[in-house]
Amino acid sequence: MRLILSLPVLAVVLAMVLEGPAPAQATTDVSSTSESILGKLKEFGSTVEEKVRTAIDQIKKSNVPEKTKNWFSEVFQKVKEKFETTFS
């Protein structure tokens, strides 16, 4: 999962670095630029992590898995009854 998230982040960072500074920006040294990028990446990573954890918690608290299980059980029971009546 980390690899899936890190590849798009790496692509965005490379695009930002290769794009270069905007004309209105003053020239900065590489170390401050890399620190800025790392800070933004950490902020982005923590934001994504919070959102994913929140989504997982909501799924765990919801009764969707139970409803899905019940639905499949009901459908299976109906199919089973249909086979019994058809082939008996």
Curated annotation (Swiss-Prot):
One of its GO terms (cellular component) is high-density lipoprotein particle. Coiled coil: none annotated. The keyword Transport applies. Residues 1-26 form the signal peptide. The keyword Signal applies. Keywords: Lipid transport, Secreted, Signal, Transport, VLDL. InterPro entries: ApoC-1_sf (IPR043081), ApoC-I (IPR006781). GO terms for molecular function: fatty acid binding; phospholipase inhibitor activity. Its main location: secreted. It is found in: Secreted. One of its GO terms (biological process) is lipoprotein metabolic process. Pfam families: ApoC-I (PF04691). Belongs to the apolipoprotein C1 family. Inhibitor of lipoprotein binding to the low density lipoprotein (LDL) receptor, LDL receptor-related protein, and very low density lipoprotein (VLDL) receptor. Associates with high density lipoproteins (HDL) and the triacylglycerol-rich lipoproteins in the plasma and makes up about 10% of the protein of the VLDL and 2% of that of HDL. Appears to interfere directly with fatty acid uptake and is also the major plasma inhibitor of cholesteryl ester transfer protein (CETP). Binds free fatty acids and reduces their intracellular esterification. This is Apolipoprotein C-I. It comes from Eidolon helvum. The lineage of its organism: Eukaryota, Metazoa, Chordata, Craniata, Vertebrata. The gene is APOC1.
